[in-house]
From Swiss-Prot:
Subcellular location: Cytoplasm
Gene: tsf
Basic residues bias (residue ranges): 286-297
NCBIfam families linked: tsf (TIGR00116)
Principal location: cytoplasm
Keyword terms, alphabetized: Cytoplasm, Elongation factor, Protein biosynthesis
UniProt-recorded name of the protein: Elongation factor Ts
A Pfam family annotated for this UniProt entry: EF_TS
GO cellular component: cytoplasm
One Gene Ontology MF term: translation elongation factor activity
Chain intervals for the UniProt region annotation (Involved in Mg(2+) ion dislocation from EF-Tu): 82-85
Residue segments, region Disordered: 223-297
Protein's organism: Thermosynechococcus vestitus (strain NIES-2133 / IAM M-273 / BP-1)
Family designation: Belongs to the EF-Ts family.
PANTHER family named in the record: ELONGATION FACTOR TS, POLYPROTEIN OF EF-TS, CHLOROPLASTIC
Length: 297
């Protein structure tokens, strides 16, 4: 196989607009032949996909897939440029195939390498640096080994680099590029979420044998209690003494006091002048009676 230089890859990219990795693969498949590489890219539908990669994708479709039994579910958003393509049956089929792909890939967490956080990449790099396979090797060799191992590890986490479940000869990324060339618009997998029934819930471990034994023992105890209740003689309770009936004397009803009519105030109170005259007249009258009584005696 002829050596593929970066200059040759760049030249093929400028001619076709395909991605760098696609151009490199095309040159490898064609043994460095430029025309054969262009033909290979056109057959794969990748020659024009790279030119559309920078276009804005604001339309598209959000679709779902529920696996048989309802234990795995997927939500995915795939974008395109126009609603015309979004309503296309081929585009809808593509989105549904991508959702099924996600359901079949439990280790996939990201769409592409660009979506992986830098902290996560550095963590994986440190793990790769601690490998025993690097011991005794020159630093430059170690760096190459780490770079290759890191790329492989990270790609296993990305959806675009997984073999397509319906055709293992191509990746999901190549599948998308084929539809870009066929539908004439840029297509991008934006995001997805995979759901697994019971994921993250701590399940209580139970011993089936112990559980059955406990249930059997409880049933026996209940049966023994019921049998004992049936054979025991009925309890005769003593009659309660009758409550003494006491005749209560009727409470006499209070008798209202007879009201005496009050003297009219007008008879008791007279004019000041009249009061003094009356008093004097009464005195004279009584005095006259006394003198007559003395004469009789």
């Amino acid at each position: 196989m002829a050596e593929i230089s970066a200059k040759l890859v760049k030249e093929l990219r400028d001619k076709t607009g395909a991605g760098m990795m696609d151009c490199k693969k095309a040159l490898q498949e064609s043994n460095g032949d430029m025309e054969a590489a262009i033909t290979w890219l056109r057959q794969k539908g990748l020659a024009s996909a790279g030119k559309k990669a920078g276009r804005v994708t604001s339309e598209g479709l959000v679709d779902s897939y529920i696996h048989t039994g309802g234990r795995i579910g997927v939500l995915v958003e795939v974008n395109c440029e126009t609603d015309f393509v979004a309503r296309n049956e081929k585009f809808k089929t593509l989105v549904q195939d991508i959702a099924k792909q996600i359901a079949a890939c439990p280790n996939v967490e990201f769409v592409s390498l660009d979506d992986i956080p830098a902290e996560y990449k550095e963590k994986e790099r440190q793990i790769a640096l601690g490998s025993d396979a690097l011991k005794g090797k020159p630093p430059e060799v170690q760096e190459k080994i780490v770079a290759g191992k890191l790329e492989k590890t990270l790609k296993e986490l990305c959806l675009l680099y997984q073999p397509f479940i319906r055709d293992q000869s191509k990746t999901v990324e190549e599948l998308v590029k084929e539809h870009i060339a066929e539908l004439g618009e840029n297509i991008r997998i934006r995001r997805f979420q995979r759901f697994v029934l019971g994921e993250g819930i701590e399940k209580q471990e139970t011993n089936l044998a112990e559980e059955v034994a406990a249930q059997t023992q409880a049933m026996r105890a209940a049966a023994q209690t019921a049998a004992a209740a049936e054979t025991a003689p009925p309890e005769v309770s003593e009659p309660e003494p009758a409550a003494a009936v006491t005749a209560e004397e009727p409470t006499p009803e209070p008798v209202a006091a007879a009201e005496q009519p009050a003297e009219p105030v007008s008879e008791l109170v007279e004019q000041p002048g009249a009061e003094s005259k009356g008093f004097g007249a009464a005195t004279k009258k009584s005095g006259g009676k006394s003198r007559s009584n003395k004469k009789k005696k």
